[in-house]
Amino acid sequence: LDVSKNTELEWIYCYKNALTALDLRYNARLKWLFCYENALTSLDIGNNRELTELDCSGNLLTSLDVSCNTKLTSLFCYDNRITSLDISNNMELTGVFCYKNSLTSLAVGNNTQLKNLNCSHNRLTSLDIKQNTLLNNLNCSENSILSLDVGNNTELTFLSCYKNRLTMLDI
């Protein structure tokens, strides 16, 4: 898929194909990218600083750099092979769906607008959500989390934390 000459593109829907590469360096105006369920092993979105919605789920990604994408409000990167995810620069995020990866840590302290977080089916041993006071939905099931403090999360309407190693749950 060659979109290098389509510099005015704001939306790309290329999901459920067999794409192994996607060159987006000339698509600086891109706001919405839906490239889920392909065969992508890498995704460079460093030049796509206008991105607000990204769904790259169901690929073969081992890493994802969203540090330049400070306007992101929704991030769907589940069902990949991602081992680390730094979302500390993405302070506009309201939804992060990074389940079914290989994450060993996830820092969400800077993401104070976060309302939905699904980080289940990873390898997390801890999750600090004290700063995420707007959180409505949290699914951190099937990790190795030892303790979980949801005392500051008074807006929670859904909490799923089964199949962890919890010895302490502060509600």
Question: Predicted segments — roles?
Answer:
Residues L1, L22-L24, L43-I45, L64-V66, ...:
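Canonical leucine-rich repeat
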Residues L1-E10:
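LRR N-terminal entry segment and analogous cap-like coil->beta motifs
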Residues K5, Y26, N47, C68, ...:
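Residues on the solvent-exposed faces and adjacent turns
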